[in-house]
A protein has these predicted regions:
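Surface-exposed repetitive/solenoidal architectures
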Residues: 1-230
Length: 230
């Protein structure tokens, strides 16, 4: 079974500061993905977090650079000017993201969790300049989710989310139903900075899917987009 449930215990804070934490789950759709000739059938899929009112303090800093790769079949080096021109982009076609949970292919449930800290994602071209890049969505709880997601009893405290394109305080990009309830904020609430699609709760929710929010009150301190210097 590739689908796992995490139950948080104890009385302290799960402080990820300085740990090099880069999110749980893979960065791309795990269901049928492949990267060149490398199959990705057995990637971790965390589908439930039972927070038990515990606090997770995030500290994620991801910088994606243009690179040279070697084609597996021809053996020749390929210059990749921009990350979104990646030769095997089909592996990232559905959802991809960075967050506490990076990408969720399957239905995702998170409840009774307190979240604080910072996530920062920036992409750079061959000249070392940051640019707007839609390859990775960024969200406080989940970067990209392909199935339905249900969040309840979430508290956001001084949470800062920076992304290269699609960014949301809770969810970067969703292609399915969203149900949010009993979500609140404390202190400064939520700061969100994105390259383009940016929202206090959700950066992008695809047309035609259910989007329900109830019994929630959140202080969204700032939502800002196209500020690549952040």
């Amino acid at each position: 079974n590739k689908n796992f449930t995490v139950k948080l215990t104890g009385n302290g804070t799960y402080d990820l500061t300085g740990t090099g934490f880069r999110g749980i789950n893979q960065l791309f759709d795990a269901k049928d993905s492949n990267l060149g000739d490398i199959k990705c059938d057995y990637t971790l899929s965390l589908t439930t977090i039972q927070g038990n009112d515990q606090t997770i303090k995030l500290d994620t800093d991801i910088k994606a650079y243009a690179v040279k790769i070697t084609d597996n079949k021809s053996g020749s080096a390929i210059e990749i000017q921009d990350m979104d021109n990646y030769k095997y982009r089909t592996a990232f076609a559905s959802v991809k993201g960075v967050g506490l949970i990076n990408c969720s292919t399957y239905a995702l449930t998170v409840n009774n969790l307190k979240l604080s800290g910072k996530i920062s994602v920036k992409t750079y071209n061959n000249d070392g300049q940051s640019y707007v890049n839609e390859d990775l969505s960024t969200g406080g709880i989940v970067g990209g989710v392909q199935s339905s997601c249900t969040f309840s009893g979430i508290t956001l405290t001084d949470l800062e989310i920076y992304g290269a394109y699609t960014v949301g305080g809770l969810i970067g990009k969703s292609t399915n139903n969203i149900n949010i309830s009993n979500v609140k904020s404390e202190n400064s609430g939520v700061y969100v900075y994105g390259g383009f699609e940016t929202g206090g709760l959700v950066g992008n929710s695809q047309k035609g899917n259910e989007f329900a929010v109830k019994d929630s009150k959140i202080r969204i301190n700032k939502v800002e987009f196209a500020n690549l210097d952040k």
